[in-house]
Amino acid sequence: MMSARSVSPKVLLDISYKPTLPNIMELQNNVIKLIQVEQQAYMQSGYQLQHQQQHLHSHQHHQQHQQQQQQHTQYAPLPSEYAAYGITELEDTDYNIPSNEVLSTSSNQSAQSTSLEMNNNNTSSNNTSSGNNPSGFDGQASSGSSWNEHGKRARSSGDYDCQTGGSLVMQPEHKKLIHQQQQQPQQQQQHQQHIYVDYLPTTVDEVAAAQSCPGVQSTCTSPQSHFDFPDEELPEHKAQVFLPLYNNQQQSQQQPHQQNHAQMHFQNAYRQSFESYEPANSLNGSAYSSSDRDDMEYARHNALSSVSDLNGGVMSPACLADDGSAGSLLDGSDAGGKAFRKPRRRLKRKPSKTEETDEFSNQRVMANVRERQRTQSLNDAFKSLQQIIPTLPSDKLSKIQTLKLATRYIDFLCRMLSSSDISLLKALEAQGSPSAYGSASSLLSAAANGAEADLKCLRKANGAPIIPPEKLSYLFGVWRMEGDAQHQKA
């Protein structure tokens, strides 16, 4: 089934007849010719023409569209021509370009010149349109587009496609045409307001280009007015950093001795900034180590490399050196400039982790050996003490009990020597039975009240008496048992 939808034919753009394009609007007119759709098959009613004549403020825009549509009919083939060759289905290729994108590329001057050309051709287009239409309708009616009272194109029955359901659907090419015709009066009003926007360069390269080519950008020929910094805000050495960047286009005009003077001045300021960091006692008895010196050398080399990178190779390290100095800044640490070198000081070698671990383990082993020796010697002392002190076979003394028994034995010996218990020994020998524990108290009292004459005679005759250990042990055992019995009674 053949589609009843009317499509816009494919139109090729031919601008070969124009040798040059002096004005952008000439290209715009050629493009707008492709946008317009063939509208001669539609006729409008007469009452819409009366509304058009009442509004004179939109008459100029109507005539421009009328001229463009008439020019389009000269080049655009009719659908009947395609049908003559047996082509029923046309390729629906959309060549519509929004007019706002085309108009945005034009300048204000081109818009003004184009409007003048349009006004000059309005009278001729009106005459030709009236001559071509014998029926008495205006040229706008012959082109198939009418304008309402608001200066907009009124929709006709041809703009809608009758589908099978009976609903009216606006064709896409007609929608685009209406949208373009609504935007074109707004674009013309903007061109008539004569609004000029000056483009101010914002980068250093554009400023340099504007200064070298003053004829291209006449709106901003003095970049100093936009990049005027007060002198007190920039230090002297930082002003030289901006010098190669800002005067990149003026290097051919500068003198060589001025550039050398600026480089020498920057070098002196750079040296002074580093000399301020050196302490007064840095040469003799310095507290700085070799690592501090290496860090300072590394920072100095990084600073020099960054300065050379900012200058873009203009200030090389070779030109930083003074003519009368023995060496440059880069050769100061190697060629004899010992300003930053500190005297080396031998540090104690720090032991490694394995050495520290071995030393700690050895110390721990020696401490354990000493502890075992001390405990062993203490046990030996207690054993010897238990052998000296008279004990009973049933005694199982701890270390504390052994010490207490030793104090009691010492007390017993002191009493024996002070109270002349020699008589007690004689009494024990007279009884001959060491099992008489019941008379121990009487024996002790007799010893306390014994005759001193006998003791003195024995001392004078035989000297100090010698008491055998077994007898002392027996007496201590008797005294100990009596003391325990008295303690229990109390």
UniProtKB/Swiss-Prot annotation:
Coiled coil: none annotated. SMART domains: HLH. GO terms for cellular component: nucleus. It is found in: Nucleus. Residues 48-74, 98-167, 330-359 are annotated as: Disordered. Residues 54-64, 339-351 have a biased composition (Basic residues). Its main location: nucleus. GO terms for biological process: gastrulation; Malpighian tubule morphogenesis; mesodermal cell fate commitment; regulation of striated muscle tissue development; ventral furrow formation. Involved in the establishment and dorsoventral patterning of germ layers in the embryo. PANTHER family: BASIC HELIX-LOOP-HELIX TRANSCRIPTION FACTOR, TWIST, PROTEIN TWIST. Efficient DNA binding requires dimerization with another bHLH protein. Homodimer. This is Protein twist. It comes from Drosophila erecta (Fruit fly).
